[in-house]
Amino acid sequence: MTVERVVSIPSGVSVTMDGTVLHVKGPKGNLQRDMWYPGIEITIGSEDVRFTTESQKKAVTSMVGTLASHCSNMCTGVTKGYLYSMKVVYSHFPIQIKVVGETLEIVNFLGEKYPRSARILPGTTVKVGSDEVTVTGIDKEVVGSTAANIERATRIRDRDPRVFQDGIYIVSRSEQ
């Protein structure tokens, strides 16, 4: 019994294999990822990419779906891109946010004297509005990690979360 997952390639996207690295090129940019796993064969056709295995082991059959999902996310990223919308919430002390190089600086959070900072990963674009932050990019994992870094930077410890609700929170994530 073989397990097979098929990912269709959208128009305007080219998919190539270089050894074990899958390269996806599209109108928004290029992505690459190492897709090697023992027992899994990757075949690139003219309109689709096939991930197959002959193994009966659960770990290998699960990995077929995982690699297919990675390929599908890469194809979506280079055609549409990913967008995370975040909301800035504060009650008493107004939070000031600005992008400084590769970090997002959060000033006056809960009236703190020193600013907090969140790392912006390469390959993402962060735009700051009055009470919103948008994170965009073509790599789903990098965009999600950057949004998580921003949310984690405003985490409040040792206080009641029902009272202290200040922070920057992810409100929606979507394809652009």
From Swiss-Prot:
Q: Which UniProt keywords apply?
A: Ribonucleoprotein, Ribosomal protein, RNA-binding, rRNA-binding
User: Gene3D superfamilies under this entry?
Assistant: Ribosomal protein L6, alpha-beta domain
Which biological processes are named by the entry's GO terms? Answer: cytoplasmic translation
Q: Name one GO cellular component term.
A: cytosolic large ribosomal subunit
One GO molecular function term of this record is:
rRNA binding
Is Transmembrane one of the keywords?
no
Q: Report the domain of life of the source organism.
A: Archaea
Instruction: Spell out the InterPro entries in the cross-references.
Output: Ribosomal_uL6-like, Ribosomal_uL6-like_a/b-dom_sf, Ribosomal_uL6_a/b-dom, Ribosomal_uL6_arc
The family line of this record is: Belongs to the universal ribosomal protein uL6 family.
Subunit description: Part of the 50S ribosomal subunit.
Check the record and name the NCBIfam families matching this protein: PRK05518.1, uL6_arch
- PANTHER family, per database record: 60S RIBOSOMAL PROTEIN L9 (PTHR11655:SF16), 60S/50S RIBOSOMAL PROTEIN L6/L9 (PTHR11655)
What role does it play? This protein binds to the 23S rRNA, and is important in its secondary structure. It is located near the subunit interface in the base of the L7/L12 stalk, and near the tRNA binding site of the peptidyltransferase center.
For this entry, the protein name equals: Large ribosomal subunit protein uL6
Its gene name is rpl6
